[in-house]
Amino acid sequence: CEDVLIRDCTVNAGHTLLGIGSELSAGVRNVRMENCRVDCEVWRLLYVKTNPRRGGFVENVTMDGVTAKKVTQDVIAVSSRVYYGMPGQEVAGPNPQLTRIEGVTMRNVHCDWALRGVTLRCDPDYPARDFRLENVVIDEVFENFVRVENVDGVKLDVTARKIHPDAHW
């Protein structure tokens, strides 16, 4: 899947505004979402999720000019080890097929309320690369504001106007 443009949308129902994965085995590239508004409660605004048994790539994903009211999980989340409850599935085997994740940009995003801000948790054996978050504003954050693991080349311009006392950095 490549060269996807999503723009000028108003979302009134759904669980993730832009979700990529989890069972991809080929690739996703050049995805752009711009000037969208989320009027409902969603789990996440941008979620990239991959399974270490599938391989493939995710590259050049941009979200620009998005407003949201309530995000019940993460404003942006990336996980390169997503499993769906099959016993033994969490073991990728001797030759895991890790997914290359690079070139993810989120800019000019405003969210009124989020449980968590930024959660980027990637594989230590194949770190994600080149993440840019520019002018991302969250009015209230209740748990982790920023958590980044195994990502090379991260640039964060993320503001939380109010972080609740039990939130972690």
What function would you assign to each model-found segment?
Residues 1-169:
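Extracellular/periplasmic carbohydrate-active domains that bind, remodel
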